[in-house]
């Protein structure tokens, strides 16, 4: 199992510093605004917006902030920015492949910040297509282990299009084709199983095993990249043990 998947499910628990928490809130709100602009402001008819709102709520973003983001995105309130999605490819220390997804209103600024973060932390920019082939777009649902078992999750999602269920330590990861994400999420809801997040994500097909020094370097690079207001998600193909991740956490 990819070490980055495990890291991604726990990193929000590390956002104890107000500045980090504020950045996380801003990115979740931006996600809601863009989802509303792309597919309309009604969550019932816009599954991407529904999932963005649920993720924001589960990370304690105030409802008022969420509501305003929906209104800005759907044109009911002024102040929305013209955000564009840009994907940059790169390598981190030890040849770890990186896809850096930006949601920005200034492509030049985003590219400069990503390039600076990479070069200052043992990474490098990569040509388009040289990294992306190592990842596949998947629907990813994270389910907390509390009160449920892997068999419960499997039983609920198997007929809904789920491809596999992975044990991430404190949670289960359910993978599907992106088009089956809503069906999988709905199947869990129908079975009374709470989920932490449901979203389209990029999952690596191969992983690079890292020792503790290598893991420390790549996690530092990811932290620096995610510190940029323009960077929404960083996908990486490293693999580390649960024990090592706990020590570094």
Curated annotation (Swiss-Prot):
The superkingdom of the source organism is: Bacteria
Give the CC-aspect GO terms.
cytosol
Q: Which Pfam families match?
A: TACO1_YebC_N, Transcrip_reg
Would you kindly state one Gene Ontology biological process term found in this protein's UniProt entry?
Answer: regulation of DNA-templated transcription
Indicate yes or no for the key word Cytoplasm.
yes
The alphabetical list of record keywords is:
Cytoplasm, DNA-binding, Transcription, Transcription regulation
Q: Where located?
A: Cytoplasm
HAMAP family per the UniProt record, alphabetical:
Transcrip_reg_TACO1
**Protein name in the entry:** Probable transcriptional regulatory protein Sare_1779
């Amino acid at each position: 199992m990819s070490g980055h998947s495990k890291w991604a499910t726990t990193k929000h628990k590390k956002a104890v510093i107000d500045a980090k928490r504020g950045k996380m809130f801003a990115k979740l709100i931006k996600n809601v605004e863009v989802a509303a602009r792309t597919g309309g402001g009604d969550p019932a008819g816009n599954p991407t917006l529904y999932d963005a709102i649920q993720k924001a709520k589960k990370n304690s973003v105030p409802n008022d902030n969420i509501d305003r983001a929906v209104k800005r995105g759907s044109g009911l309130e002024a102040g929305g920015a013209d955000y564009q999605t840009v994907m940059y490819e790169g390598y981190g220390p030890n040849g770890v492949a990186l896809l850096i997804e930006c949601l920005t209103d200034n492509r030049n600024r985003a590219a400069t910040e990503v390039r600076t973060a990479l070069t200052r932390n043992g990474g490098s920019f990569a040509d388009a297509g040289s990294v992306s082939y190592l990842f596949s777009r998947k629907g990813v649902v994270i389910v907390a282990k509390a009160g449920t078992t892997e068999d419960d999750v499997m039983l609920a999602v198997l007929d809904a299009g789920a491809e596999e269920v992975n044990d991430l330590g404190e949670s289960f990861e359910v993978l599907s084709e992106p088009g089956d994400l809503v069906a999988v999420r709905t199947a869990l809801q129908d079975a009374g199983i709470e989920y932490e997040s449901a979203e389209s994500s990029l999952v690596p097909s191969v992983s690079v095993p890292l020792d503790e020094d290598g893991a420390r370097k790549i996690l530092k690079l990811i932290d620096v990249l995610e510190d940029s207001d323009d960077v929404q998600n960083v996908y990486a193909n490293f693999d580390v043990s649960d024990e090592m991740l706990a020590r570094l956490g």
